Amino acid sequence: MNESTVKYSTAFRSFFDTSFFQELSRLKLEVFKLSSEAQKLYSKVEPSKSSESSHLFFNGNSFNPDSISDANSTSVIGSIFNFNKIEGFKDLDKHQFLQDRAIESWEAGLDDINKAVSFHVISFADLKKYKFIYWVCFPYFQLESLEISCTNVTEIENCAKYQDWFNNNRSQWVSIVDSNCEIGSYSKNAFNKNSKLLIRDTSKMKNTPSALAKNFLSIFKYQNLEVKEISVYFVREDDSSFQMSLKLSSIDNEVTPKLKTSGWEKNLLGRLAPLSIDLSTLIDPLKVAGQSVDLNLKLMKWRIAPDIDLDVIKERKVLILGAGTLGCYVSRSLMAWGVRKLTLVDNGTVSFSNPVRQPLFEFNDEGKSKAEAAAASLKRIFPLMDATGVTLNIPMIGHVVSNEENIKKDYEKLLELIKEHDTIFLLMDSRETRWLPTVLGNIENKIVINAALGFDSYLVMRHGNYYGNAEKRLGCYFCNDVVAPTDSLSDRTLDQMCTVTRPGVALMASSLAVEVFVSILQDEKRNNISTEEKTVLGEVPHQLRGFLNNFTTLKLETPAYEHCSACSKPIIEVCQEQGWEFLKQALADPLLVERVSGLEKVKQEVEELAAKSFDWVSDDEELVEL
């Protein structure tokens, strides 16, 4: 055979599963963030029957080193450079990038020739549109001064012996056969004039080695300058292995030799160009929606609030009592913060006046249960939302108990819901509706957030907790009252029956209520965090009172009142001991609540003090003429 220049085929062809890009998205958001430094990738060599080269497959496990722990497969370790901007991807000097990676492989190969095999991926991930652009390179290099020519090609005798050796030594790409036909690992000192070189070959083209042979032969020649002719066995897993007799020219003896490089993968049209993929149409839309919804939240952790705990928010089970204007806006804000479990409770139905003020309803919902319609709307907005609507009459203090059996069922259902959830939002229309949930929320040690509206004012507050510091416990919605709540719903005119308020007030109160809730979750003390402490989001106020007539917001703090009708120690302890029996009487008779809490005694003392202060002097002689 005449002497000829050796031709090479591509060593690998890459294949990417959609799970790879899904995992890249997750890691970019949660781990890599703004970093565009190299991240390790792991892949296995898979023989191909139809392609001219072996395959490297990439999936969601390719970021995990355990994915190549299989002793029966040949693995390759590489890296991915994911750019933060598409401009970074486009402006990258691809030739220099490949040159740098080739030098890395060259230097690694000088220490261990088996490490001269690698791959590298450059990419840009558009996480909003779920589109990805990427390009893979397999660094092939050859010494500029080295010429490799072939003088003969023959079949390999007893090839099974060499195949078995490579199958038993999966991490080895190059080995040596000595004069006694014994196979051993390659080292620059182990080769002599009677030795032959064995190379694991991933090419499928007849008598054509993969381009990785250039890497190995360049390193071999650099370490064995005196060798000018060599017999190389290219060992494949099928029956197409072959032997080549090669001539290696002299090379420049340089400390840092120059390399000729290649290796960017061609696209399906045979052109050197990156590939792109749009996963928005290929994977489960619900999965895309779930990751997309979390996108803005996870971006907070990149720069602005790296220590914020988003998982603790997502895991909350929130009970919203009242599915009106406040309930609708609070639900939307909670959903935006990543809460996935919401239960809405209301006893009303949607009226034609509701949809313009209550964003979870529309014209066609008229007459439907508010709670159920709101929950259905949340699921339409985001199908992965676990939203439930419960139509329920919350027992109200000061209202006549007309049907004890029904009211007891309502009480038991409310108690069940409170036990099942972590946080309660009190967003009902009347004060007396909030009394029982306030009491039960304290007993069950839940986070309770309260929001209430006036015409041009609002109140947002977090309730203190019975189980907290007795001396510094924060007050609840009823701690400023000197009487127990009574029936405020009977005998009202139309303007009193409807929530008459400036439309923007509800949005302001709702958003603040949710922000207070999120801030509480950032501290392990939850209910018991004081107003003097700060979380990663800043302060956690007790009360916020806003006034739109002069556009001011007051940040207030009031301690728990020892005689509070809802959260005082006597009320909580009696409720714990007697349960429904006490509550049944308390709902019908607010004066009982005043007696138990001590409010009645306080009122008596105030009246006695007032009587003494205004005790008129009846003795005319003691009158002073003015």
From Swiss-Prot:
Cellular component terms (Gene Ontology): cytosol; extrinsic component of phagophore assembly site membrane
GO biological process, one term: cellular response to nitrogen starvation
Subcellular location field: Cytoplasm; Preautophagosomal structure
Principal location listed in the UniProt entry: cytoplasm
Molecular function via GO: Atg12 activating enzyme activity; Atg8 activating enzyme activity; identical protein binding
Function noted in UniProt: E1-like activating enzyme involved in the 2 ubiquitin-like systems required for cytoplasm to vacuole transport (Cvt) and autophagy. Activates ATG12 for its conjugation with ATG5 and ATG8 for its conjugation with phosphatidylethanolamine. Both systems are needed for the ATG8 association to Cvt vesicles and autophagosomes membranes. Autophagy is essential for maintenance of amino acid levels and protein synthesis under nitrogen starvation.
UniProt record similarity statement: Belongs to the ATG7 family.
Protein's recorded name: Ubiquitin-like modifier-activating enzyme ATG7
Organism: Vanderwaltozyma polyspora (strain ATCC 22028 / DSM 70294 / BCRC 21397 / CBS 2163 / NBRC 10782 / NRRL Y-8283 / UCD 57-17)
Gene: ATG7
